[in-house]
């Protein structure tokens, strides 16, 4: 009888632990956002509240960094020769310099990622419309689920800008 009871307890423990794993993963991907507003170029982008912010003196954008220094991002805007650029040309230029994983490449936007060494991922997104608004996000591979969710939220907020 003790033998059967031990097996039942062991199975119940394993089932409980397995049920908790997806819940932990789901919580890890929950991202809370703050909003960066650029008054010079009149655009806004949501960014994870886990980042601290330091704006560029030029007014072009901002730098973001995690408290532990393992993740960072930059958000910027530029005007100029954007009439000659598209998401496809941005990706083509990036491909010349490194092996990238293209997520999207259209006339008005592109996104791609690549590995920097074994433990770091860099994700880039560019939105082109009357100029370029972009962000670049660098993070440890161990935090991929969280920062992938963060990138999606940042992209969605960036696309809401009219210029």
Predicted regions and their residues:
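N-terminal targeting sequences that direct proteins away from the cytosol to non-cytosolic compartments
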Residues: 2-63, 68-70, 131, 138-163
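Conserved polar/disulfide-associated segments of primarily extracytoplasmic proteins
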Residues: 55-149, 163
């Amino acid at each position: 009888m003790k033998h059967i009871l031990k097996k039942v307890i062991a199975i119940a423990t394993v089932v409980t632990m397995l049920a908790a794993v997806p819940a932990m993963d789901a919580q890890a991907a929950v991202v809370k956002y703050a909003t960066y507003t650029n008054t010079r170029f009149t655009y806004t982008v949501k960014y994870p509240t886990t980042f601290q912010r330091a704006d560029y003196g030029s007014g072009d954008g901002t730098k973001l960094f995690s408290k532990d220094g393992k993740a960072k991002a930059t958000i910027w805007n530029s005007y100029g020769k954007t009439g000659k650029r598209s998401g496809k040309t941005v990706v083509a230029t990036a491909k010349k310099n490194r092996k990238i994983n293209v997520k999207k490449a259209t006339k008005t936007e592109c996104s791609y990622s690549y590995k920097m060494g074994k433990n770091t991922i860099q994700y880039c997104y560019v939105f082109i419309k009357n100029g370029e608004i972009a962000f670049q996000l660098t993070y440890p591979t161990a935090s991929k689920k969280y920062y992938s969710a963060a990138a999606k939220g940042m992209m969605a907020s960036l696309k809401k800008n009219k210029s």
